[in-house]
Amino acid sequence: MDRSDKKVNVEEVNVPSNLQIELEKSGTSSSVSLRSPTKSSATNLAGMAEGARDNASIASSSVDSLNMLLERQRVRQLNHPQHQQHISSSLAKTPTTTSSFCSSGSSKNKVKETNRISLTYDPVSKRKVLNTYEIIKELGHGQHGKVKLARDILSKQLVAIKIVDRHEKKQRKFFTFIKSSKISENDKIKREIAIMKKCHHKHVVQLIEVLDDLKSRKIYLVLEYCSRGEVKWCPPDCMESDAKGPSLLSFQETREILRGVVLGLEYLHYQGIIHRDIKPANLLISGDGTVKISDFGVSLAASSTNSSDSSESLDELELAKTVGTPAFFAPEMCLGEDAFTRYNLTKENLFRGSCISFMIDIWAVGVTLYCLLFGMLPFFSDFELKLFEKIVNDPLKFPTFKEIQSNKVSKVSCEEEYEMAKDLLLKLLEKNPQKRMTIPAIKKHPFVSWDFDHVPENDEKLLSSVLEQKLRFQCNQTDQFEPISISKHELKNAVSGVGKKIKESVLKSIPLKDPSDLSNKNYLHPTETTRGRGDANVIVSEGSVLSNIKELSANDGCLNTDSDTNININDDDHYSGDDNDGHLTKRELERELNKFDDKHEAGNMVNLPINSSFASLDSFYIDNFAMARMGMSSPEAGDSVSSVPNLPSAPSSTRLGRSPVFSGVTNQPSPIRPVLPQQKSSFCATGRYDKSHNSLLRNSSSHLTSYNSGRPSSRTGRMNSRNQNLPKIPNSLSKISTTKLTELRVPKDSEIPSPAKNPNADRLRRFPVKKNTKTPAIKDPPRININSSDKSGSKNSPIKSLYQRMKQSKDNSKTFEVRRGNFFSHFNGDDDDSSSQSSVTSSGSESDSELSSTSSSCTSGTQSRNSSNNNAYSETESLPFEFGVDSEDGSGVLLRDLPNEDQIRPFLDIQPCRRMKVKSSLNLEPPSVSSSSSSSSDEDELILNVGTAGHRRRHNSSKLSELSNSPQKGSNNFMYSNGSVHDSETTITPQNMDDLTLHQALSRSQPISKPGPLVLPKRLDQKKATTETSNLTDIVEFNGNNDHRKDKNFDKVLYSRDLLKDALSSTNAGRRRSIPSNKIRGRKDASITMSTNVGNDEHARNTSCHGDKGQENGAIKQRTHERSRSLTVAELNEEKRRSALP
């Protein structure tokens, strides 16, 4: 009983799972009792039967759906709507093993059409991926485009991708004899695609897929790859026209190639296609030695003449009469219309009166056979017209049998074989196309079947196999082919960019979801195509995950793309199978894609635009583009704004420590404050703190605040002149009381309000924030030179006090707004009465040495004279943005930005004029530089405002001329450019003496090594001869002082002045006299006074002593104090006579 129970259990396992489930649901006792044991044994074996049902279900489903899984996987990789319907219907009718092979063959013959191209590139491994094809190398390039070797990622199949231009390149039409009716490149592409879509034969190169994106200027034809390349018949270093033999192939190899070409050509002629360019270069050999015909660019679909488009086809036929290779032209093509009279041709037997027929391919086969046998062309010439004449008139010539037998390549067996080869060539290269050999006659020729007929009779197995091959070759293949028809409409719509196929299909269907909405982690987006109802085929892209495209009802006619994954697979096809079949297929495809991703790092892949630059896959700057894209979105770079699509990323650092527009590096500590990057609070784009960002986002130039009046933030040396005319900031924005400064604190994260008014706040990424972040104070910030000897200045250091306040106010936070705008504007924020802003400021006292040195070099704005007594100079709001609390660019503060009195300036560096304590006998109060100096400056003249009077001093004045030409004992304290030319034609104009007072005082106290003003006058612009001179003696006397009075050259200077007077008076005696001199200034006791300020009366009192001390020289001193005027010769002689008297 136990054995029988076991046998019954074995029988239960063999029951199909679907039938077993139905039997259990039905509950019919009669059917169950036939295969179930007795009641007593059934209770004992209930657990065993339950476990066996699961095993039976899995085993039966695996066996029955093995072929279905393969077919379903192939179906999901197709991309044309008609293919899905065709395969689904064939599988639904006969879901058997034989039908699956048939459908696989039919699906293999179908050409995929893709109108969405995705190109990615890995700059590290130099790997390019076009949709699902990985580009390996270049196979070659020719007239119509390049050919690339690629590998299908899913099927691991090697393919050849032919890249052709969508539009014909513009050519020069000058001095050319090209007919306007010549076939265009675009028509060749359309013709080739339309023909290859219909042709599916063993000896014809298979078109696998057409990648045709309207955005790209290139069309990619994915072709079958022939690993052994084209047929070679001459040495590679020799041109075809210069080849003289022998051939590179033997007679037997040539015979096998000929048989493959004849079979492929027979198929094409049966389909009504004239190849028109049969030659060895268009014959490719696959890895197994199969010969395949390629390049249908100039082919002619002759079957279209029977359609309604016959008139249009006739025009197309006339356009394509003389295309191809001239050396392989048939005689009727060379003659044209004369061929009808010469060969007595009837137009009814040809194509609508044209000389084009199938016979031109037969002639080309004969020329190809001649090249393969003898290694040279039958007719050749350097000129095309002479070549045509030879093709029509010259007889065919052959080398002798001894020459062929002597070479070690041909390997001809006997002379009879050679004669058979000559006979075949004579029949193929018949001048008259009506007498030329046909394809059935070629197949039965003795030379073609020579190896079939000369097999040793001893080997019966070999004999039987060879006989079978001969019968298969010589049989008529027309019964095995299905005729195709290529109409004019199909030629136009062969390329989707030319016809209306996309526009028509879009009206009937809804395309897939736009790839831009998908995840950015996948670098190859799924190919989007026009789809009909019931279509669930997609082209799988690299790195994509296949799962669950669920088809909607037939009434909806669209796909469900709402799942989380990128690509969905239809699990509800027209197949009757188990539910786990689709999941098995999904796992297999995912496994293949995961292997591919593991082998190649997908993180380095960069999407390339499909344009004219990168579409050829050979751009010279593809690496630069890819590296730039990787640098923008690289996670290693620490770019915090990379996730925000609307914010452009910027480099992490710029030159000279200046801050970029967007702060990109957040993890690298700044040199000025190595602990501050740990803070989690930062400024938003509005200028306020935001706890949700850990990086500092600067406003771009298009989002400037009102403080800079729309001016861009520049860091160049022209900032001083660019920001001179900025409007004055209101007092309410620039004034901050001292009590407010003491309450100024770094805000806590909890007290920071969120920028609700910022429209871009929702698009910015939020980061977690650590509460109560402590920031230790920095005692000695790096790269800041603070004079330790000056204790009073160190207490008021703006940078140091800023960190001290940060340390003291970490518990009492208050929100404040950093003032944006000009880098140099309002450093101290304490200017109330200045109407302009200057970058050249001066410090007015000794107690503010450190602050004054800082403001004189790197700050701007209008600093008041009592800035040393004001404690509000280092407030945080008035600091520039780079010195803010959360500035990410502390390296912007360099040593040259914070100078002190002992700083060593660069060689010959022009520094601004500074207020200094003048220690001289004059006891002059040094006037300060007015804040309006820069606003009143001009490009044509250099003006230095001295004193509060605001007198202007031109560098081409007489005082500078005298200073530059007069000899001095000590080192010259001023530097003058070489462009200043002082000659007799220079206009000399008298000026006030207050200008000279300042320079003279500065010259005594400031040697060249000390930081002082270096005056460089410009080239004199006015060079006009005149008799008006200045009171040169007054200038020399005043400028000389005691040192110059003791100089031996003092008299020489006075004497040279007299000579100048004589020269001017003698040569220009008839000119207009000058204005009468001032008699008051002519007196000896005359004093030089200043008319501008009461505080400068001391100048007049101190300078009056020069007139009293000048009594020693008598009459000479009296003449020098007189105002200069034009003198006659008589007056000069009289003065000389008087001076000569004792």
From Swiss-Prot:
Its EC number is 2.7.11.1. Residues 82-93, 640-656, 707-741, 785-799, 958-971 have a biased composition (Polar residues). Transmembrane segments: none annotated. It is an enzyme of class 2 (transferase). The modification Phosphoserine is found at S964, S1126. Residues 133-448 form the Protein kinase domain. GO terms for cellular component: cytoplasm; cytosol. Residues 22-41, 82-107, 634-678, 694-799, 825-875, 919-971, 1005-1027, 1066-1142 are annotated as: Disordered. Disulfide bonds: none annotated. Present with 752 molecules/cell in log phase SD medium. This is SNF1-activating kinase 1. The gene is SAK1.
